[in-house]
């Protein structure tokens, strides 16, 4: 029986690690780790790795008629039993060093850019927009892929074109917005707003663009409950915002500006964060996380 130790680890991020399987395949393993403010917290969130993996599989399958993806299998003899349910067997790709972000609503770093300049990544927006405003149409707001521990930096479309070429940049923009549009439509049908999301693309043999990494998970996307949507204020969300809020509260006792690592998360914050991740999966997919993984998934 194969073990994870049989596969050399070739990369590790805050949440995932990548192992070499053979010349054509990699094993992408999601952990229960959670990061905030560029720190990996010492307290894991139970089942988070399963949610990220199951949700990626759901979206890869749903979007397969829109864009090819790197998923080979989620249930395969080459996947060690110790990571089954939170690991994907994927194709090797030549990944592009561009974070392809689509935004349908104004929040986060996009809102900060807009407040400073009236634009996001060079895309000029109407006056009078506020927190959580729905944009007239979704926009492509790319970012550079930062090294571990550093911040991604929002850049203009022109900067992407300079880095990868005008034709490929235009293809990335068109594909990003097309995938976002399909995903946002599905989420809306499930009573959820997909405010924004990040995609990563790679190039396969022949030069075709392929969707890689994770896709449309609570770690890479902002999901809001549609029934409580109210522009002008911060929206409740199905992601790690609850953790961020606790870390910046007086209760945590942590000074974000200090060099000290964040404190361990209390049990109630862990439970509430887990519940948000699980709810995101179950609302979006209509499936029960308790059934993942199963041969019928």
Swiss-Prot record:
EC numbers: 6.3.2.6
Involved pathway(s): Purine metabolism; IMP biosynthesis via de novo pathway; 5-amino-1-(5-phospho-D-ribosyl)imidazole-4-carboxamide from 5-amino-1-(5-phospho-D-ribosyl)imidazole-4-carboxylate: step 1/2
SUPFAM superfamilies listed in its UniProt record: SAICAR synthase-like
Transmembrane domains' residue ranges: none
Gene3D superfamilies listed in its UniProt record: ATP-grasp fold, B domain (3.30.470.20), Phosphorylase Kinase, domain 1 (3.30.200.20)
Catalytic reactions of this protein: 5-amino-1-(5-phospho-D-ribosyl)imidazole-4-carboxylate + L-aspartate + ATP = (2S)-2-[5-amino-1-(5-phospho-beta-D-ribosyl)imidazole-4-carboxamido]succinate + ADP + phosphate + 2 H(+)
InterPro entries referenced in this protein's UniProt entry, alphabetically: SAICAR_synt/ADE2_N (IPR028923), SAICAR_synth (IPR001636), SAICAR_synthetase_CS (IPR018236)
Protein's GO biological process: 'de novo' IMP biosynthetic process
GO CC annotations, alphabetized: cytoplasm
Family: Belongs to the SAICAR synthetase family.
Name of the protein in question: Phosphoribosylaminoimidazole-succinocarboxamide synthase
Lineage: Bacteria, Bacillati, Actinomycetota, Actinomycetes, Pseudonocardiales
